[in-house]
């Protein structure tokens, strides 16, 4: 049964709420390396994304669960402020992310916000299945969230200036604004 909310505010986790990608940051931290965010791994991710993710999940699943459940990154304070504004405006807040479940729930507990996991490109499907809403706000950095952004009445996109064109071409007629990565109030 769908949850009925008048106003829904959807936030992505990695590189949106968090100042970084929690999955890769935990891998680098735990294994005391930078290999998981290296150029080499980025190339593997572009050439063979499924193999790249298999490697990452293989390494991730070997990290003790208590470490995975408690790992958090620094928050982007501008987004935390935006979350508080949306809460004050009466929005029902939810984090929708494809981050590993342990990392997603760690953020959920610390921020006192419901978190829902969705596969790449499936966030809008998960939202439509779970919620009935009148108005939706989306905050993300992901190019793969275009379908979610197209559902929105209002959006904030956190990205590098060089990536704006991608969103501009696909979101004609939408009410959105950009926050440049690294910008803080």
Question: How should these model regions be labeled?
Answer:
Residues 1-55:
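Active-site neighborhood of HAD-like aspartate-dependent phosphohydrolases
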Residues 50-67, 107-111:
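Short, basic/glycine-rich phosphate-binding loops at helix/coil junctions
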Residues 22-26, 39, 43, 54-59, ...:
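Exposed alpha-helical structural elements
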């Amino acid at each position: 049964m769908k949850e009925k909310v008048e106003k829904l505010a959807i936030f992505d986790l990695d590189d949106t709420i968090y100042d970084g990608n929690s999955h890769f940051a935990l891998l680098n931290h735990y294994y005391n390396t930078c290999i998981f965010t290296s150029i080499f791994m980025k190339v593997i991710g572009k050439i063979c994304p499924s193999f790249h993710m298999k490697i990452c999940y293989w390494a991730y699943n070997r990290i003790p669960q208590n470490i995975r459940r408690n790992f958090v990154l620094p928050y982007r304070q501008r987004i935390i402020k935006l979350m508080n504004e949306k809460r004050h405006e009466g929005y029902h807040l939810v984090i929708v992310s494809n981050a590993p479940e342990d990392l997603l729930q760690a953020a959920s507990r610390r921020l006192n916000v419901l978190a829902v996991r969705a596969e790449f490109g499936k966030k809008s499907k998960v939202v439509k299945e779970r919620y009935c809403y009148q108005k939706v706000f989306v905050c993300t950095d992901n190019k793969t969230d275009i379908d979610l952004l197209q559902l929105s009445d209002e959006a904030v996109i956190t990205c590098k200036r060089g990536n704006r064109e991608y969103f501009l071409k696909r979101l004609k007629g939408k009410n959105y604004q950009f926050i440049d990565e690294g910008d803080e109030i």
